[in-house]
Amino acid sequence: MSRYEVDGVDIQTLPKVSLHDHLDGGLRPQTILELGDEIGLELPASDAASLGAWFAAQSNSGSLPEYLKTFDITTAVMQTEHGLHRVAKEFVLDLAEDGVIYGEIRWAPEQHLQRGLTLDAAVEAVQAGVEEAIGLVASHGGRIRIGQLVSAMRHLDRADEIAQLALRHRDRGAVGFDIAGPEDGFPASRLQSAFDTLAKAHFPATVHAGEGAGIDSIADALYSARALRLGHGTRIAEDIVVEEETDEAIVVRLGQLAEWVKDRQITLEVSPSSNLQTGTIAQWGTALTDHPVDLLHQLGFCVTVNPDNRLQSGTTLTRELGLLVEAFEWDLDDLEQVTQNAAAGAFCSFDEYEELADEIADGFDDLR
């Protein structure tokens, strides 16, 4: 049993959907030690507990660029077919253990070519690990559905190539495209031709926006990338003015961009703990209770809750939901709403969505 409960229900037992979860941010510390030993990688700690603590400490810098430096270690042990296969398999098994029934794994294949893998071989290795894990979950009476989000690094110049990679694997595990890396100064419009290619092929994209940069970045992601979801999207709150707040009600005025995102129900992939670590919510405060996620949720935005990087944040989706229950007194209805939001935003077929939505509703009803 987890320590996180809502209305007397263990949150870990609830069906969950994870949309924003980085493969190179979800390694088990013991796996890093073992894979690192195989390649002679020098690590900052020699046991799993200490290594996990090191990642958490390094990630609490309040700076997105500093936070991203921790990935130098995780990607170093993910440069072979064996390493990628193992990491992907364990990643999915850990999701299933946490109650996730549908998950999308985002990762950037271009960061995993240092030991001779091709882009396609890297994607195939991850897919093989995913499929092995799905089979293991099924053999124990469970079920989990997983898709790959193939990411391009926004500050590099391979987006067109990575977009074509995603399209080659659209029927072999890839369900969507993403751009990641430093957001500020690297708008989606830099990669316009890649997004044009994807749009012409009717392939969905989510874009990291509203994390390391503000509403101009969000607007650009929606316009240039035709983003169906916003990775984090937290800083859309910069376009909301609170005009009056009492114990009974809150009166706000939405700017045109915020109104568009709300009215079109564009999915916000909010990652609360990560947002604290990277300073995303610094303008509102430094505690989780300062995070605009509750305001966005109460106003009817399509909020979803995600772990982002389970290793760096020392977290799980259960924990992220539990923290919001503690901070904002969310109840089962709130958790079901954000979970259904995630199902609606998932890059799957409409038939798969309907099945997923029913499974979520039944799962919550059974625990009420």
What are these regions (language model features)?
Residues M1-F203, E211-R229, R235-R368:
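Metal-cofactor-binding active-site regions of metalloenzymes
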